[in-house]
């Protein structure tokens, strides 16, 4: 059961964090805000995911894993794995924006690859698991980036 929380929390953490960053970049907002919004979202969403998982299991769970451990695993995975795409933004004062954006893309891909590999270790279908996780992650990023780009260009002028 902890493995499913790891995959669930990590996947949602990466997609949520990258979606925020992609939205900021798509709306052409200064990348320095990605760190502020990314960290705030990472912790608040991680807490929400963990506590929601805990409360959803507390009265109905007959599993070997306690609802607390399930919720904790979801939170920890969300924050640790979801924080990987945010790491390059800690180096904004040392590198240019292009480097930061590229590092974010590569670190995001690495985080998704790790989740897919862990899932693949469980299912024994490595390529399928990694491909599935990567496609879902890419879809989340594209939705966020293009939504922000559209909103900035068509609905909100002068941001």
Locations of regions flagged by a protein language model:
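Short helix-capping/hinge motifs at transmembrane helix termini and TM-loop junctions
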Residues: 27, 89-93, 122-123, 152
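Cytoplasmic-side transmembrane-helix entry/capping segments in multi-pass membrane proteins
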Residues: 127-136
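Membrane interface segments of multi-pass transport proteins and intramembrane proteases
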Residues: 90-99, 156
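Juxtamembrane boundary at the C-terminal end of a transmembrane helix
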Residues: 145-159
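Hydrophobic, small-residue-rich transmembrane alpha-helices and their short perimembrane loops
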Residues: 1-88, 101-107, 111, 140, ...
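Transmembrane alpha-helical segments of integral membrane proteins
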Residues: 108-124
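Residues that define the loop-to-transmembrane-helix transition and helix capping
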Residues: 31-32, 98, 127-128
């Amino acid at each position: 059961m902890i493995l499913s929380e790891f995959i669930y929390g990590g996947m949602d953490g990466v997609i949520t964090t990258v979606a925020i960053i992609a939205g900021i970049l798509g709306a052409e907002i200064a990348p320095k805000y990605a760190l502020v919004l990314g960290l705030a979202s990472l912790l608040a969403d991680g807490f929400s995911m963990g506590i929601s998982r805990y409360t959803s299991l507390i009265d109905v769970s007959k599993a070997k894993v306690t609802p607390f451990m399930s919720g904790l695993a979801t939170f920890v995975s969300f924050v640790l794995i979801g924080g990987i795409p945010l790491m390059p933004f800690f180096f904004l004062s040392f590198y240019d924006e292009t480097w930061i954006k590229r590092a974010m893309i590569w670190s995001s891909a690495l985080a998704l690859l790790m989740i897919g590999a862990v899932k693949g270790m469980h299912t024994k279908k490595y390529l399928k698991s990694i491909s599935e996780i990567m496609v879902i992650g890419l879809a989340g990023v594209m939705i966020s980036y293009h939504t922000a780009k559209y909103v900035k260009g068509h609905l909100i002028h002068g941001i």
